[in-house]
Amino acid sequence: MTIGSDDLTANTSIKQIVEVIDERDKPEKLMKCLEKYTNADTKNRMIVFVLKKTDAVEVENELWNKGYNVVSIHGDKDQWQRTKALESFKRGTANVMVATDVAARGLDIPDVEAVINFSFPLTIEDYVHRIGRTGRAGKEGTAHSLFTQQDYKLAGCLVKVLKDAGQEVIDIESCVRFILNLTKLFVSRCPLRCLNLT
């Protein structure tokens, strides 16, 4: 990963999938993602990133009620609670960890098969850090992001990161144009400085 004002790249061993969806469809899409990346033979480790602490609690409770072995890490937890959750995730006792960006940097968790961005991050740098939790130590990983109309300001920069990592971006470009048309915004008003979509 390289981060700088004009030089931002993602690990090319991470398959990046971006779904442009309606905000209301996120809970259903999350369940489909978890089903997709869960392997019956192994306990695939997955991190689900959210923006807010309240979202972390809500998503953790929902997944627990659906039968997932899940823990969460966020700013309202004491350090000992975060450490306990992290150890449970590393040991495989819990195979899903719901986290705010407190877990996006500095944590070395081996064998995370998938990162799911339930809430898209506020900056493209945070996106690159989040997805960097998978595809570590020469292994491949998957980053699946749910991108909504509210995230449109990062669309151009996201497309650039995807292209630079050799990912398929045709669908997201079309969807970004669609979102911009729906919201009657013009490219000149949007911070799409990273890529000209016209």
Please give the residue ranges for each predicted region.
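Conserved helicase RecA-like core
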Residues: M1-T198
